[in-house]
Design a protein with these regions (language model features):
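Tandem repeat scaffolds
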Residues: 2-10, 16, 20-190
């Protein structure tokens, strides 16, 4: 279901009040809504309930998702540069062709999530929009993934150059064709 801009703005304003313990505040519950393509850079979605939300093609540069419930959310083609996902629930989340450069994913739960580049051959199977695309990498350059739970996560064709993977649990994770150059893998469970 697609949100109207007015309803979304009202929910975000009420959420900001809730975060600051102000009267009229209400925790955002935007689960299974669609905001595809919107410019949401710098917004604070900390501790919001956003399971299954469609953030595809959104500009989320610098957005804050600390401790947010993003179970099954779709961030395909989103710009998440410098976004903060500290301790967020990202189980089953999709990041097809997303830009996560310098994103903070400290202590996230990304079990069974997918961080993939999609080729034109398998694109239709994964992308509801059925658009044609050329193969691209998911950019996670210099991202902080320390202590993340990435058990059985699909992190195929990702550019993790210089990423902090300190104490990350990658048990069963698929890192095929990913660049791990200059990564800190100290204490990582591979």
């Amino acid at each position: 279901m697609s949100l109207t801009t007015q309803i979304f703005v009202e929910a975000v304003k009420a959420h900001q009040l809730w975060l600051n313990n102000k009267p009229g505040g209400k925790r955002a519950n935007l689960s299974y809504e669609t905001v595809s393509g919107l410019k949401l850079a710098g917004l604070n979605f900390s501790r919001a309930k956003m399971s299954g939300m469609d953030f595809s093609k959104c500009n989320l540069v610098g957005a804050n998702f600390t401790e947010a419930d993003l179970f099954g959310a779709d961030f395909s083609y989103a710009d998440l540069t410098k976004a903060n996902f500290t301790e967020a629930d990202l189980r089953g989340a999709q990041f097809f062709n997303a830009n996560l450069t310098e994103a903070n994913l400290h202590k996230v739960d990304l079990r069974h999530g997918e961080v993939l580049a999609v080729t034109s051959d398998d694109h239709q199977a994964h992308d509801k929009r059925k658009e044609k695309t050329r193969e691209r990498q998911v950019r996670m350059v210099a991202s902080n993934l320390s202590e993340a739970a990435m058990v059985n996560a699909a992190v195929s064709q990702a550019d993790l150059t210089g990423a902090n993977l300190h104490n990350v649990n990658l048990t069963g994770a698929n890192l095929s064709k990913s660049s791990l150059m200059d990564c800190d893998l100290t204490g990582a469970n591979l």
